[in-house]
Design a protein with these regions (language model features):
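Hydrophobic beta-strand scaffold residues
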Residues: 13, 60, 89-92
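Short, glycine/charged-enriched secondary-structure capping and boundary segments
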Residues: 4-5, 28-30, 75-79, 106-110, ...
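A glycine- and Lys/Arg-enriched "phosphate-lid" helix/loop adjacent to the NTP-binding pocket
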Residues: 83-132
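A non-catalytic, amphipathic alpha-helix used as a structural packing/dimerization or gating element
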Residues: 39-46, 124, 128-135
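Post-Walker A helix-loop "phosphate-sensing" segment adjacent to the P-loop in P-loop NTPases
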Residues: 7-16
Length: 156
């Protein structure tokens, strides 16, 4: 969705997941398992602050992802940006039906006992992150049945 908004607005897109992976010397698909999670989150928080600063200085769409909001400094930074810049920045939270997100993340094997605990943990994590995202958001967009381009147009 960030790419869709960037294309509409003519702005570059700063993807936190990609930048963290680059910093760790791996691909975005493997970054979270390539290093211990605490190391990943530490790098993620530092890089999130950098991309937010870059967006303020030069203009950009920033795709943060919900994981970085586990660090309270990121939420505070987003609130500061909103206050200092008189709401010229819009914080968008993406929501999606749990079943659809499970499918998108490969947790949809039919009647798999092995995935039961993983699915339960996923749902708990999802609810915690959705609450954090929605608390910070100016707009919540449901992506359950939309493409990234359609979701981007809803924001605009």
């Amino acid at each position: 969705m960030g790419r869709a908004i960037g294309a509409i607005e003519g702005l570059p897109v700063l993807d936190l997941g990609r930048r963290v992976a680059d910093e760790l010397g791996t691909s975005p698909d493997l970054a979270l398992v390539a290093v211990p999670e605490a190391d990943y989150r530490r790098v993620e928080a530092r890089v999130a602050c950098q991309v937010l600063d870059h967006a303020v200085a030069q203009g950009a769409v920033v795709a943060l992802g919900s994981g970085c909001l586990g660090d309270p400094r990121i939420g505070l930074r987003l609130e500061e940006l909103r206050l200092v810049h008189d709401r010229s920045y819009q914080i968008v939270a993406l929501a999606c039906a749990t079943r659809v997100l499970a499918t998108r993340n490969g947790l949809d094997a039919p009647r798999s006992v092995a995935l039961g605990t993983v699915h339960h943990q996923f749902v708990q994590m999802l609810h915690e992150r959705q609450a954090r995202c929605q608390d910070l958001a100016d707009v919540v967009i449901d992506t359950t049945s939309t493409t990234p381009d359609e979701a981007g147009k809803k924001v605009m």
